[in-house]
């Protein structure tokens, strides 16, 4: 029985993870559930899954949860960053699902890595922000990091076994790999008139044609910033160069990514667009378990199409690729600016097309400095957020 900590238990990845646990109750136990402040959702999860620990980032939410839990349930309720770092490092913890959205997920994810845990990485921002520090921590602790994002999980499945065992230090060329082909659907605005993009609403941006996701990642998909963040994540996970990484627009989301080999072969991982598949793969690797997902019906798939990304339509993707080339400081600034600009768009404060403008402004105006510690990263993250907030206020 593997005991799991689920960071971001009340989110979409958390729900999918718990669904896979339900499919395999003899093998997995939700040992600790972690959320920000969604007390109602956490209460329901506690009653259903009876974890040993329920942790709320927000202290007031933790106090409310403690009051509302049935008296007969022996669930320890906690709050605070230090307490969370201690939870993921507990000796009885076998596996940590890192699914807290955004920069907020970095400290706990890094704590799990430093504790040498098996970490299922769904928080791409951890690598986007901390890059080399994250990889060094992983290698220094012998933590096993497995990628949950459907694209990176697909790439991982298409790699030869020695490369799978060398996450963060892969020798792609030595493994006979010429390119990693990172696929993305293009989101809901792939064929929209360019002049109409400035008028798109948050609800329109969140109507992804294939995937069911949270609102922040849905907007990132609409702008293809999500693919840009995944590009940066792939650079670190697979030790890839700019020449080895390519983005391919694939509207059907059937092929989740591909690996191209020097002999002309291309290996692709395919499946229905359901996050339970990569989650189950990571939970059981190198074995396979039931995910509760219907198998792909090739007779219903129909046409598969592929396009080059249009940077006029998706300027955020270009910003991310360029930031990745510039280095860790630029990707940290970009991630922070994007979180602020997307939040502002969802709140109705700026237009959809302003997201890229705010991000570009911060990349060119925030003073970048060397990032040697997690404190350096969080300080630069704070600077970029303030710059983005000031820019949003002027739009």
Curated annotation (Swiss-Prot):
Which InterPro entries does the record cross-reference, listed alphabetically?
Answer: DXP_reductoisomerase (IPR003821), DXP_reductoisomerase_C (IPR013644), DXP_reductoisomerase_N (IPR013512), DXPR_C (IPR026877), DXPR_C_sf (IPR036169), NAD(P)-bd_dom_sf (IPR036291)
Q: What is one GO biological process annotated to this record?
A: isopentenyl diphosphate biosynthetic process, methylerythritol 4-phosphate pathway involved in terpenoid biosynthetic process
**Cofactor(s) required, per the database record:** Mg(2+); Mn(2+)
Pathway the protein contributes to: Isoprenoid biosynthesis; isopentenyl diphosphate biosynthesis via DXP pathway; isopentenyl diphosphate from 1-deoxy-D-xylulose 5-phosphate: step 1/6
Q: Which residues bind 1-deoxy-D-xylulose 5-phosphate?
A: 124, 150-151, 185, 208, 221, 226-227, 230
Q: Which UniProt keywords apply?
A: Isoprene biosynthesis, Manganese, Metal-binding, NADP, Oxidoreductase
EC numbers for this chain? 1.1.1.267
Known function: Catalyzes the NADPH-dependent rearrangement and reduction of 1-deoxy-D-xylulose-5-phosphate (DXP) to 2-C-methyl-D-erythritol 4-phosphate (MEP).
| Name of this chain's protein | 1-deoxy-D-xylulose 5-phosphate reductoisomerase
Origin species: Shewanella loihica (strain ATCC BAA-1088 / PV-4)
Q: Which gene encodes it?
A: dxr
